[in-house]
């Protein structure tokens, strides 16, 4: 089954590639080329991007910053990533709009739900930056929120691992990968795939979550085509 309207969640760390910080142009190029194939198949795609490659609000708070202030800095980091993604997408011919939850009209449109949906219907990619505009909410929660707002059929969480495991596969060789699991299992077992607010939002709105490896070339288009390449939460 090919999905028709998809919300893709990209972590900021995914944009780093092998770099310790910032944005790897080669990764942006690879993502853009994969997205171009998705759009060519008449799939409507919106993207929520994180900011952890530049600044992470929770870490800033742990280091002594006021939590709300740290979160706002993190929101600005997501806008930097959103604009960089827009540049990469437009260089491969994909018409793209950036919408931000915090107004900065010189560089992006303000987030307006109806306008975002019109862009999608016209075959444009919409990249949502600035989180949801409020501190104390993660970009995973933003992804769940925007998916519900634009009536997306699925949230696709593109990450550094190839699915959901019962423990950290980088630390435990015996870690077990789930091909599928329920929202309730994620919540009750406290599986660290997305925060509980994001999972609950998807559960309440019956939006499945596909978790897959972003670094394998072509995985975005495979996931959109409905291939079983990661873990499905539903």
Curated annotation (Swiss-Prot):
It catalyses: UMP + ATP = UDP + ADP. GO terms for cellular component: cytoplasm. One of its GO terms (biological process) is UDP biosynthetic process. It is found in: Cytoplasm. UMP binds at residues 51, 71, 132-139. Inhibited by UTP. Keywords: ATP-binding, Cytoplasm, Kinase, Nucleotide-binding, Pyrimidine biosynthesis, Transferase. ATP binds at residues 9-12, 52, 56, 159, 165, 168. CDD domains: AAK_UMPK-PyrH-Ec. Pathway: Pyrimidine metabolism; CTP biosynthesis via de novo pathway; UDP from UMP (UMPK route): step 1/1. Pfam families: AA_kinase. Its EC number is 2.7.4.22. One of its GO terms (molecular function) is UMP kinase activity. Homohexamer. Belongs to the UMP kinase family. Catalyzes the reversible phosphorylation of UMP to UDP. PANTHER family: URIDYLATE KINASE, URIDYLATE KINASE PUMPKIN, CHLOROPLASTIC. This is Uridylate kinase. It comes from Prochlorococcus marinus (strain MIT 9515). The lineage of its organism: Bacteria, Bacillati, Cyanobacteriota, Cyanophyceae, Synechococcales.
